[in-house]
Every structure is written in C-alpha cells, then in structure tokens.
Amino acid sequence: MTTHPLTMPIPEYFEEILESVRSDVSGEVAQYIPQLKDADPNPLALAMCTVDGHIYGAGDDEHEFTMQSVSKPFAYALALQEQGPEKVFATVGLEPSGEAFNELSLDGSTNRPMNPMINAGAIAVNQLINGSESSVEDRVEKIRSYFSALAGRELNIDRQLSETEIEGADRNLSIAHMLRNYGIIEDDAHDAVLSYTLQCSVKVTARDLAVMTATLAAGGTQPLTGEKLVDARVARLVLSTMASAGMYDEAGQWLATVGIPAKSGVSGGLVGVLPGQLGLATFSPRLNSQGNPVRGVEIFKALSEDMGLHLMSAELLTQHAVRAIEERGDTTVIQLQGAMNFSAAENFLFTVTDHDFTGEKVVLDISRVPMFRPMGRRLVKEGLRRIRDNGFKVAIYDPEDILPDFDFSDGTKSPQVDDPEEL
C-alpha cells in the first residue's frame, strides 16, 4: 500500500479562528507612541508552542513588533531568577491594583508598587536586573540576551521606537522620580525609564512569544533547546502573578472567562500559558479601553472554550492520551484514554503521525474516554479521516456513546464497530 505522511489539522483550525474575528475593527491602536499610532492596525496572528516543542502558527505569525508590556513577566522571571524572591518581594508586591497599567499604584504601608505587571512595578523590577551598579546598556543587554534564550533565537531592539517613546515618557518619568524618592530604585529616573523602555522595545513575533510562554508552561525548560532558564518555583510565581494582575483592571473577568495566566501589551501582543501544556500568543494592534487587544481577547475566549484551557476545569490532561497501539492481525487498534481536550488530541495526532501502520484496517478505541471537548473531538476525528484518506479502512469503537456523531469534515461518516476486532 502506498501511504503518505499525515498532516496536522491544527493550523487550519487556527486560520478559521482568525477569520472569525478578522472583521472586528473595534478599538484603536495605541495613540501615545508615534510608531504605534501610525502602525498598520490590520495584522492578525496566532501561534502556539507545546511543552514538547511543537509549534503551530497562522496569519501574520512572522510579523515583528515590539514587546511593550508583554515583556513584563519575562523580566520579572529574570529578576526572580537572578536576585531571589525575597529581594524582589521587598521591592514590588503581588497584589492586583485594580487600576490602569500606567497608574502609580503603591502599597500604602511600604510604598512598594502593587505588582510587577503595572508600569511602576515593572520599572522597579527592571532596576533589579544585573544589580544596582549596572549601567543601562549592560542591564538592557542582559535582558535582551535572556529574552533571546527564551525565544530560541537572537532578538533585536527597535532603537528608533525607544528613542521616540522616551521623548513622550513623562508619566513613566514621574513614576520613576516617585520610586526613587521612596527608595525603591537607586538609578537616576531618566536612566531607569530608558532601561525599561529599551526592555519594552525588544522585537518579537507571535511565534517567539509562544515559545517564550511555553518555557514558563514547562516549568522553566526551553522546549526547543532543552535549556533550563527558569526555576520551577520562579515559573509558578510568574504565572500566578500573570493570573491575578496580567490583564490590568480586566484581570478578574479574564480569569473567570478565559481562565489562564496572560499578559497583554499596547503594541497588540497577548500571551497566555496553560501550565504543563502549552504557551499561546496573538498579535492584533487595536486595543480596548483597558489596553488589551480586542481581537486577541476574542481569540483567547474561543480557544479556551474549544480547547478546554480553563485552569479551573477538571478535565486537564493528566496522562498520555494514547494508551496503546496494538497490531491484531491486519487491524491496528489505537486505544485512547482520559478526557480529550486539545492537548490530549494533539498527543494523539503526533503519535499516529509518527506510527508505521501495518495491515489494512485501523480501529479507534475510545471506550476509556469519558468526554470530548469540541476541539478534541474535531482533531481526533480529523486525524482518523486522514488515516482513512491514506488508504486504510477505519472505524470507531465507542461502547458508551461518547461521541455525538461520527461525521468527518468532508461530509462522510466513520463506521462504528461493536468490537475492536470486527472491522
């Protein structure tokens, strides 16, 4: 039998998600940075990286943009890794502020910024990196190099944008002066804001951000290089802070509806992390009144619903989706187990893509699957359809009637068998 490599349907699904939100032109690009104000508002991208290093992308996922506030959790990770939690916690708190990202939100008793996801906290965190005696350039190079290691490639800084941004950084300068007055930072206010602005000006793509967030999802191990860049405890601290404060004064609604740690930036980037499983990133420049990307938020809502991403869900993957693949005469039986959310279905797809099938028949045994999420159902059936289109006779063994239908995406239907060996 002539067979062909199976292809992955995930990018096709991502393209559908992008098309579903592309017509939404509400919101506006950031107005206070000239390059962002004049930027094309139409690029749209979605990228994902699993903790196993599988990367998927759609749309303008190779389009470069500056990180802006999306840089905050990664700089926070570097400060925690370098200086230790005790020193960092003495400088910046962990509580959500409930205020806009550029408010001077300080703890009333300690004068610490409320959290590292607002500008006051991010400026303070930036000043911890490479030590208080560091020059601006040495500190910024430490940050750029660390971000590059997280992304798995060399990243560059948009110096032209940072120069323009610093010219209009009056509010951040006033925040830095206040932090210096309270003894939170030691650098000259201008140098502190310059260092922070250069941090925000590191250029990335959505694919870069997906890999960077997947590193946090993997407990600090970079999924492409295998390098340990963040201690597991540090990764937990960063993700916890993203969950409580990453989406500014929209954080509570975000956690309730989407349910994963996330961080947005005014250039249009938005990242999210499903611990232990994957990192996600979108790019769409138009922002809502809270400063979060309009279409990015809608994409994450759709992904959370379809893929079963919510942290409070009881169905998150705890075991390998493929229990066994057995050759029984001329029939290959693929046994699945556990709840079929996106991560489980992706595990199934990668397993069958690499498998060298023998014989002429393939039966998918889902007797140990208690439920399917919409995206899990779609990916599993699409994978089976592509096995069929590769020349095999296929069927599904579903004694508990877990699947509501056996329809494939091309309008055909998979047969059902009462015994895995009867096909």
Curated annotation (Swiss-Prot):
Cross-referenced InterPro entries: Beta-lactam/transpept-like (IPR012338), Glutaminase (IPR015868), STAS_dom (IPR002645), STAS_dom_sf (IPR036513)
Domain STAS: 321-423
Alphabetic keyword roster: Hydrolase
SUPFAM superfamilies linked: beta-lactamase/transpeptidase-like, SpoIIaa-like
EC id: 3.5.1.2
GO molecular function: glutaminase activity
GO-annotated biological processes: glutamate biosynthetic process; glutamine catabolic process
Superkingdom per UniProt: Bacteria
Swiss-Prot/TrEMBL catalytic activity: L-glutamine + H2O = L-glutamate + NH4(+)
The keyword Lyase appears for this protein: no
Glutaminase: region residues: 27-312
Residues the record lists as binding substrate: S69, N119, E165, N172, Y196, Y248, V266
HAMAP family per the UniProt record, alphabetical: Glutaminase
Subunit structure: Homotetramer.
Family (UniProt): Belongs to the glutaminase family.
Protein name: Glutaminase
Species of provenance: Corynebacterium efficiens (strain DSM 44549 / YS-314 / AJ 12310 / JCM 11189 / NBRC 100395)
Lineage: Bacteria, Bacillati, Actinomycetota, Actinomycetes, Mycobacteriales
